[in-house]
Amino acid sequence: MRNLKFFAVATAGILAFSSCKKEDDNNVNPGEGNPSNEKGIVSLHFDNVYKKVGNSIKLANDAKSEGTILTSANNQQHKFQTLKYIISDVSLITKDGKEVQYNHGDPNKGAQIINQAESASHHFNIPNIPVGEYSKVKFLLGISEEVFKKGENFQKEFFDKSTKEGMNWKWKNGYRHLRFEGFYGTDFSSAFKLHLGDKVASENANSIPGSIAIELPIKDILKVQKGQTSAIHIKVDLDKYLSGVNKITLSKTNEDIHSVVGADEFVKNIKEGMFSVDHLH
């Protein structure tokens, strides 16, 4: 009889353990160490457009050639010849606030140069994202000051790539986080350059980071599923360059900027409204 009781208790214990184990296996927490097979891929797409109407920006080869003509809120016309920026330190935020980071602090693995002239550069995949629901995407426009301070050898692969793309001023002066160039005026005879970079420290001044932290809500909620690829399309509205929070008129005083110094109005326009999540699929 004692043996029968022991067998019954033992069997109940095994069944209870089996039930708990099965329940635990199905309890996927997107922000915390899911099993490696409970992962998906997120593809980020950056669409450079004018006034969010879905029209891609066509670059002009020179002042006289065709290109998308943008008209600012101050009724000034301009067009882009070069449109490049760096994306790094991407994070996805779950509905309950947990952050999943993608190669933060390592531009060799986690940074991308978006170049309007190269369509293949407009999107990149982020693998091994835990399954779950995500309500925000964050990234850095540029490379952080902390990463730059790690030295050239640490980030040589990406720095060499940025050199080929014209996205740095050689090592001493750091990265061009963003590079907007083009022409403006009634006959487009005037040129503008916005090269957003750090103000590197000198004996008489402190360094000022030029990278910009961007955080975007995902209103429809991104659902990452096991073994599937989910896409986030981020619209980059170039109308905000001159017609964002600040209504800017290009002139001799602001047409040629080569660091974060003097770029306050442009930075505010970029940070507050240029980037938005358009749709998912």
Please report, for each region that a protein language model flagged, where it lies by residue.
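C-terminal motif of bacterial Sec signal peptides marking the signal peptidase cleavage site
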Residues: 16-19
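Bacterial N-terminal signal peptides that target proteins for export
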Residues: 1-8
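Alpha-helical transmembrane segments
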Residues: 11-14
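A short, solvent-exposed, low-complexity linear motif enriched for acidic/polar residues
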Residues: 22-281
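Low-complexity, intrinsically disordered regulatory segments enriched in Pro/Ser/Thr and acidic residues
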Residues: 4, 21-22
